[in-house]
């Protein structure tokens, strides 16, 4: 076995060397292409944005209605679709984009939040001497560097630790990671390095210590995916593209080409989802960039077309920030079933994922309990046994549909393409499918190149390399200090605004409400534990937010960070949006219900509430569960599913017990796993299970609730020393 591993390592080293040598010949064309692109960017003329601010949605709809014919109409408002619109409009093409939901409402907002070259692809490229895989990695690393440059406020390098538990893995993975640095060349973010066992545990104290021999740390990029997607859309709008969300394509328009006599796609019949109004948008070329819905649009063109999309669901979960170091991620390269799991800090929380399961295409993917538990089990395997990973620690969960594709022009139509595919139908519909977030720009460039060539459009080369996205041009790491000094914002809020809006953060700050406090002067928070402020709701409407779901999931990221916090903020968000958009009381109620449904099904709330008595982590007899539920509901009169300080105070007052708020707060915090000021039923059941199993000696809250229950039945006062005595 050891010999086998040694051979593997030798192959990796030899393959790496061979790939490096081969890079001088088969990859020379690719390198020349990159050099050529860089030269075009240096010498070409980049037009300034035609709009200082993105036009309103109403103005964009008027442009869509009144323009006789666009050069390009893009269907789909994800990263690739918005990238196509930006690429086309900056070439001087008259461009339109329509999206049936919100920008980034699908897969593009449900990623792992990484901007990466693909370490796994490089491993396959070297082991199999696969030129295509190498090209993919090389291209992705080039795009990674560009994305970090054009949106510095939304992205940053992130060190990722690869813990190793066998000695042979150290040289094996070290060579592979060093090859990753080598392929990146001058665009390498930072050089990878090896950590000893003790140093690895210093960085990641919760790591499984047994048999740990050391770790390797390498660098990739991380970003705020939905905000990045939105920045691309807003930049395209500022450059003159007519972009509109909530515009559904009902059918494709066609006309006969007078030269060939063939039918050509000439636009689309579009429906405003918010008003129901329909109208035609005509274009010389239509680009299908609809992600998982690729085949739905292709069937509008040709109902007999062979499907190319093979959808796969990837589930992620969010856990409290203390599960990972603040500035370092972790990679499990070989899970129990051969998948790869990332464990990453993001927005002061921890993201864990992903899974890879065949699925059906749907507008509302739901994370399954099976996938959530798979991720939790993998997390448990990598963390010390001292750390109890609980189902209740999952603050949010989501499923994104990866649009994996087969190449219709390939001889083997069943094999999934590892790269993106640009397909042109007989009627001229351009379809871009596959690929990954990191390479959205090069995918867009290839797509518009194909459109220009096939439809004989008058356009120059792509100009998007180095083109700053909305908010990036005048951003600096110290910009937040000016926000604190000039507007009187909290430092945490100012840092959040600078990271989210870049140089546009000042516009948000100007909208901030006065708090009425000595400090901060302005910036009323939507929820106390997150730095989102009310002014962001007003500004979000300028960024084309049309619904409460848009606001909690893509303008802010509350839904992706903590579903309960998002639910808590919803009434105020709906009130603020209703004021700005003149919503009726009925519309406000509908928005509240729709957003609550979104949190319940799509963001993991349903899975969470259904697992309150999951036997895998609560080992109580059914009779005990019933008894403890009854005790819990003595405090939770409204059947909310959780109790707060107010609930405890109410019960104590009813039995004539006085206790100061600070003591009560301390008692609840002992059990409050999510640190959200609430103790949920499953948290209480976990506590009682732990008490029975002897994992904890007792709990002040457990004693308090037991004593209160007894006295509520007997209606006699509880002695103060019993209610809050130490254990």
Curated annotation (Swiss-Prot):
Residues bound to FAD: 71-99
Cofactor: FAD
Annotated gene: Gpd2
Protein name: Glycerol-3-phosphate dehydrogenase, mitochondrial
Pathway note: Polyol metabolism; glycerol degradation via glycerol kinase pathway; glycerone phosphate from sn-glycerol 3-phosphate (anaerobic route): step 1/1
InterPro entries noted in UniProt: DAO_C, DAO_C_sf, EF-hand-dom_pair, EF_Hand_1_Ca_BS, EF_hand_dom, FAD-dep_OxRdtase, FAD/NAD-bd_sf, G3P_DH_FAD-dep
Main location: mitochondrion
EC number of this enzyme: 1.1.5.3
Enzyme class: oxidoreductase
Annotated keywords: Calcium, FAD, Flavoprotein, Membrane, Metal-binding, Mitochondrion, Mitochondrion inner membrane, Oxidoreductase, Phosphoprotein, Repeat, Transit peptide
Residue range of the transit peptide in the UniProt record, numbered on this chain: 1-42
Similarity section: Belongs to the FAD-dependent glycerol-3-phosphate dehydrogenase family.
Database matches in Pfam families: DAO (PF01266), DAO_C (PF16901), EF-hand_7 (PF13499)
Source organism (scientific name): Mus musculus (Mouse)
Record function comment: Calcium-responsive mitochondrial glycerol-3-phosphate dehydrogenase which seems to be a key component of the pancreatic beta-cell glucose-sensing device.
Keyword S-adenosyl-L-methionine: no
GO process annotations (BP): camera-type eye development; gluconeogenesis; glycerol catabolic process; glycerol-3-phosphate metabolic process; glycerol-3-phosphate shuttle; multicellular organism growth
Transmembrane domains' residue ranges: none
Summary of activators and inhibitors of this protein: Calcium-binding enhance the activity of the enzyme.
Catalytic reaction(s) noted: a quinone + sn-glycerol 3-phosphate = dihydroxyacetone phosphate + a quinol
Domain EF-hand: 623-658, 659-694
Positions annotated to bind Ca(2+): 672, 674, 676, 678, 683
Compartment(s): Mitochondrion inner membrane
